[in-house]
């Protein structure tokens, strides 16, 4: 794998030196980038099980995408929303066309992040993450996608998961402004847009909890259903004041439902990150913060106890009915 990257980098440096005059203009750069993506597509299709060739083709495709992005930036102006929308379309097309797992993860993530940046440029603050969460929940909760086209949708699901966590992190630390610059949204949207976005994400979390309960045969009125939905509502309410919390819990919940350790690990990592940021950004004394942590811990322990007791009672009831 590493040998493929080294070989591709040296080859591209040599070719880039020879075609430096071409990439100074937008149209030739886009043509050259499309040609490299086409070459990567051919390599992926012809050498599906060759690690060296696959890594080589991945580097070639990434460079091609960079050239296409440069050309689009020259034509559409890199600070505008049309550039990011066009880039998202290109990345989504590559994710559909090129049949490689890692390539699809990266291009899906690139498309989702480009779409989020377009939403940011349009001053729709806080609305990118819930939009991506809808797609994330739909993919990981729909078994027919996995049964029919798992080779396509599995990497797309991973790419969306990485993108939504990165988008939340970028927004949390204002890193998106490094790319798009500071924008001036309408006053009401600047005040309430992020809160609306967190509320929508919390609603998605509750919807996922209801869907998972029904899939396991527990109605919303059952003990397990009420406990699960109540826990989701509790986390949703907490997330209104803790950016990123609902997204991390959503990823963790989807990972647990799918039995996917990667999703669970990244959900837990995101949970620690967003809770830590919320803790250190609180304008409170250390005593008040410690009290908040203690109360949160007791609430979580109480929720765990109720869920365990409800599960045991439900299992005993089913055994008695049988």
Predicted regions and their residues:
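Alpha-helical multi-pass membrane segments and their bilayer interfacial helix-loop junctions
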Residues: 1-322
């Amino acid at each position: 794998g590493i040998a493929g990257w080294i070989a591709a980098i040296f080859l591209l440096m040599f070719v880039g030196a020879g075609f430096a005059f071409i990439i100074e203009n937008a149209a030739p750069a886009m043509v050259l980038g499309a040609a490299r993506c086409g070459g990567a597509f051919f390599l992926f299709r012809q050498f599906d099980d060759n690690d060296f060739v696959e890594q080589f083709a991945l580097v070639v495709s990434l460079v091609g995408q960079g050239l296409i992005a440069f050309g689009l930036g020259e034509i559409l102006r890199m600070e505008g929303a049309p550039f990011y929308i066009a880039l998202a379309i290109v990345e989504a097309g590559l994710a559909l066309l090129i049949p490689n797992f890692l390539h699809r993860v990266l291009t899906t993530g690139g498309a989702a992040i480009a779409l989020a940046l377009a939403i940011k440029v349009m001053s729709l603050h806080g609305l990118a993450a819930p939009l991506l969460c809808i797609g994330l929940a739909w993919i990981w909760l729909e078994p027919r996608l996995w049964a029919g086209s798992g080779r396509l949708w599995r990497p797309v699901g991973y790419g969306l998961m990485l993108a939504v966590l990165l988008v939340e992190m970028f927004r949390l630390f204002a890193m998106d402004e490094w790319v798009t610059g500071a924008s001036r949204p309408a006053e009401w949207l600047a005040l309430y847009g992020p809160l609306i976005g967190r509320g929508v994400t919390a609603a998605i979390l509750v919807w996922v909890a209801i869907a998972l309960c029904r899939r396991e045969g527990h109605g919303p009125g059952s003990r397990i259903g009420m406990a699960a939905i109540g826990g989701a509502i509790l986390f949703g309410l907490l997330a209104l004041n803790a950016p990123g919390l609902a997204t991390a819990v959503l990823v963790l919940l989807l990972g647990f439902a799918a039995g996917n350790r990667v999703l669970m690990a990244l959900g837990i990592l995101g949970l620690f990150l967003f809770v830590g940021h919320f803790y250190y950004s609180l304008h409170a004394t250390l005593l008040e913060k410690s009290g908040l942590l203690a109360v949160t811990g007791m609430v979580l322990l109480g929720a765990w106890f109720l869920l365990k007791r409800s599960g045991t009672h439900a299992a005993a009831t089913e055994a008695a009915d049988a």
